[in-house]
């Protein structure tokens, strides 16, 4: 499977699943109010998780039948599967059980100091654990590299969530980040491994923009984690350190300022952010 084919298959699969899961997404337990007070399904990003599973299962079946030249489940594809399921599960728990009363690192730490463990804290703690497991596999260095790579993946996942404050924002940011990453990864094993997940994310852009569903943490965290994993698996130390610094800056900035306020003050960022959104939002 090529990178382009992986993107296309991921996008088509997630749309097929969205149509088939319409009744499930309409369940009262999944309905939440968005920033405009509209009620729509949250945790729509779980469709990305399911799409990756369907694509990988399909590749396995076709490979067993001798169709194509699939080498089997590579290490990179195994890592993507674990990342998607791990971060997807943690995000889903927060989507379904979180009350939104505590936000950001400081909010979760304040709640912990008060003797409360929030679902957001569980997601952050669990996400760090998933990231460590991802990089603590044969072929990875130990010590400093393990720490750098685990923090990079965890912060990338968290940034995906931090950006998910307006329709399409996380997916647009992911597309902007994915283009240079895809060029750097080329047609190698890592580029092919992350393509179905990214294709599935891009396949939900229209639904996110038109407010047919919300990605939720189950989707936003997964998108960020897959991009972070792509950097970790496919690039050298200089690229990883650069990405880590950028992620640290953005995660810290999110604790100090509102990304939405910054975007609204910068014309070109505002234009990108609102492109494709419903007219009511564009005129806001």
Could you say what each language-model-derived stretch is?
Residues 1-214, 218-257, 261:
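"…together with the soluble PPM/PP2C metallo-phosphatase catalytic core" -> "…together
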């Amino acid at each position: 499977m090529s990178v382009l084919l992986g993107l296309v298959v991921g996008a088509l699969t997630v749309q097929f699943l969205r149509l088939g899961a319409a009744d499930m997404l309409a369940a009262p337990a999944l309905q939440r109010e968005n920033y405009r007070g509209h009620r729509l399904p949250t945790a729509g990003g779980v469709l990305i998780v399911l799409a990756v599973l369907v694509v990988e299962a399909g590749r396995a079946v076709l490979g067993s039948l001798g169709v194509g030249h699939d080498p089997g489940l590579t290490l990179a594809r195994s890592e993507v599967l674990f990342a998607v399921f791990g971060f997807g599960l943690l995000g889903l728990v927060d989507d379904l059980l979180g009350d939104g009363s505590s936000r950001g690192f400081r909010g979760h730490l304040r709640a912990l100091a008060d003797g409360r463990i929030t679902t957001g804290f569980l997601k952050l703690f669990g996400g760090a654990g998933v990231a460590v497991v991802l990089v603590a596999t044969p072929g990875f260095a130990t010590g400093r590299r393990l720490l750098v790579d685990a923090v990079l993946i965890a912060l990338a996942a968290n940034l995906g969530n931090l950006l998910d404050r307006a329709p399409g924002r996380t997916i647009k940011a992911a597309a902007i980040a994915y283009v240079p990453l895809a060029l750097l990864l080329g047609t190698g094993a890592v580029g092919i491994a992350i393509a179905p997940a990214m294709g599935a994310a891009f396949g939900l852009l229209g639904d996110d923009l038109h407010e047919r569903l919300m990605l939720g943490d189950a989707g936003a965290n997964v998108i960020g984690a897959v991009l972070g994993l792509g950097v970790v698996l496919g690039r050298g130390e200089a690229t990883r350190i650069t990405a880590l610094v950028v992620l640290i800056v953005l995660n810290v900035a999110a604790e100090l300022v509102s990304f939405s306020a910054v975007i609204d003050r910068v014309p070109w960022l505002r234009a990108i952010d609102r492109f494709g959104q419903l007219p009511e939002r564009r005129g806001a």
